[in-house]
């Protein structure tokens, strides 16, 4: 049985959009990370004349979200794509000739991916080391573990996992794979748990957590897509529009924070969150996975309208 799906920071996100748009306005929302469709459901219910562009790189997640939004199908346009690939040309090819006013990116990995996808995102089950968010496309985690050099493994473990045991873990992996390839999550998790002394395990966390995070980021090039996606979407956002971004770990949040702050220094953007919005105590009790979720918000001001019209006239 699958667990109940929670829309992380859903109340905060809806409140911010409500403060910036009139409830009856025909707002065009773009949900760049559809997931289970929970956030989009809030938009469709909260803004009865709105439409939602529903995007996800994973066709399985997109199908799950569409099934959840079936009662609103006339107001939803779905596009299977990574949010970093969204631009006006892509939207036009799907019959959308306007720019979104409200954009949301939820950068967290879904509960479905962790516990029900069978793609090896979690070490709690013995699953193939895959970790691809777009199934069957590109390298998988098994490729990384069994083909990357020791130095390259050490680099991604340290850079993307901030794991201080990176060198030792990389050395042991390279020696182990000479005997047998490492193909399953349980094999890798057991290997790591034997490398790090038990007394040094992080409290309440499996010692393989950081390595699994690093592998997932490497396989899916997540940080690269965040940087590229924010630039593309902020360019696409309509003047007086709002973008909200949820991040879950320090690497994501650092990119989001710096990017939004840099845009806020330019004429035409206003940072609405000097500090990130954190989930309420009530939400973290109900959904412990939300405890690390940080929400940052940027608004494109009316002063950007002249630039927006100029760029649109060039395209025409």
Curated annotation (Swiss-Prot):
Disulfide bond entries: none
Record GO terms (molecular function): rRNA (cytosine-N4-)-methyltransferase activity
Cited Pfam families? Methyltransf_5 (PF01795)
* Predominant location: cytoplasm
- Which Enzyme Commission numbers does its entry carry? 2.1.1.199
Instruction: Share an example GO biological-process annotation for this protein.
Output: rRNA base methylation
Residues recorded as binding S-adenosyl-L-methionine, renumbered to this chain, are: 37-39, 56, 83, 106, 113
The answer to whether keyword S-adenosyl-L-methionine applies is: yes
Region called Disordered, residue ranges: 276-316
The GO cellular component terms are: cytoplasm
Record keywords, A-Z: Cytoplasm, Methyltransferase, rRNA processing, S-adenosyl-L-methionine, Transferase
Q: What does this protein do?
A: Specifically methylates the N4 position of cytidine in position 1402 (C1402) of 16S rRNA.
Could you identify this protein by its name? Ribosomal RNA small subunit methyltransferase H
Q: Which organism is it from?
A: Leptospira borgpetersenii serovar Hardjo-bovis (strain L550)
């Amino acid at each position: 049985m699958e667990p109940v799906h929670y829309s992380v920071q859903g109340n905060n996100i809806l409140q911010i959009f409500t403060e910036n748009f009139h409830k009856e306005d025909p707002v065009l929302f773009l949900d760049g990370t559809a997931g289970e469709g929970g956030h989009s459901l809030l938009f469709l219910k909260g803004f009865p004349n709105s439409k939602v562009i529903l995007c996800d790189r994973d066709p399985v997640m997109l199908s799950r979200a569409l099934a959840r939004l079936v009662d609103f199908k006339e107001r939803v346009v779905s596009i299977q794509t990574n949010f970093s690939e969204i631009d006006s040309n892509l939207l036009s090819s799907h019959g959308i000739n306007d720019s979104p006013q409200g954009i949301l990116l939820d950068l967290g990995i879904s509960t479905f991916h962790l516990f029900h996808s069978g793609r090896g995102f979690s070490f709690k089950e013995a699953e193939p080391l895959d970790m691809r968010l777009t199934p069957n496309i590109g390298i998988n985690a098994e490729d990384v573990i069994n083909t990357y050099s020791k130095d390259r493994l050490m680099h991604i473990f340290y850079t993307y996992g901030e794991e201080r045991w990176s060198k030792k873990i990389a050395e042991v992996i390279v020696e182990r794979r000479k005997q047998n390839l490492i193909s399953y999550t349980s094999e890798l998790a057991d290997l790591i748990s034997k490398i790090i002394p038990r007394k040094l395990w992080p409290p309440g966390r499996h010692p393989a957590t950081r390595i699994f995070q690093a592998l997932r980021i490497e396989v899916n090039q997540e940080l690269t897509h965040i940087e590229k996606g924010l630039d593309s979407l902020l360019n696409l956002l309509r003047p007086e529009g709002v973008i909200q971004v949820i991040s879950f770990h320090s690497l994501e949040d650092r990119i989001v924070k710096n990017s939004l702050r840099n845009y806020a220094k330019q004429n035409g953007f206003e940072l609405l969150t000097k500090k990130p919005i954190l989930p309420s105590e009530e939400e973290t009790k109900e959904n412990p996975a939300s405890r690390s979720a940080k929400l940052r918000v940027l608004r494109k001001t009316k002063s950007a309208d002249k630039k927006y019209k100029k760029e649109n006239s060039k395209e025409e």
